[in-house]
Amino acid sequence: MPLKIEDLKPTPGSRKPKKRLGRGIGSGLGKTAGKGHKGEKARGRGKIGRTFEGGQTNIIRRTPKFGFSNAPFKKVYSVVNVETLEKYFSENEEVTPDILLEKKLIKKLNDGVKILGKGEISKPLVVKANIFSQTAREKIEAVGGKIEVIE
């Protein structure tokens, strides 16, 4: 007898009938019907939204939708004061970002070095940096030092 598609049947025991919920204790899914006791998930409202955070304002509403922050693009300069140059460098010595890093006066170069005018300076130095404050520029040039802006 040839095998026909309409004669095919599932193997006995391979297909179980679905369990009907809430149809008595004997069914195994009576009383609470697999929903546990009380609580929001046991009620008839279904699932909680994926953005629900228990009543606090959710992150989607908290985050700004407009505007722009330039923080990731800002330039960060390593700062050195004039008083530091006075303390660690001798007369007519050249000061460069690499020398400052070597002497551990700055932790890292970042986007460059900025010289600020805190303190006093009494000896002329040749200072090479990316940016100088107005007071630092005046103090270095007043004692006969030279300033070179590097890019």
UniProtKB/Swiss-Prot annotation:
Keywords: Ribonucleoprotein, Ribosomal protein, RNA-binding, rRNA-binding. Pfam families: Ribosomal_L27A (PF00828). Residues 1-51 are annotated as: Disordered. SUPFAM superfamilies: Ribosomal proteins L15p and L18e. InterPro entries: Ribosomal_uL15, Ribosomal_uL15/eL18, Ribosomal_uL15/eL18_sf, Ribosomal_uL15_bac-type, Ribosomal_uL15_CS. The keyword rRNA-binding applies. GO terms for molecular function: rRNA binding; structural constituent of ribosome. It comes from the Bacteria. One of its GO terms (cellular component) is cytosolic large ribosomal subunit. GO terms for biological process: translation. Residues 23-33 have a biased composition (Gly residues). Belongs to the universal ribosomal protein uL15 family. Part of the 50S ribosomal subunit. Binds to the 23S rRNA. This is Large ribosomal subunit protein uL15. The gene is rplO.
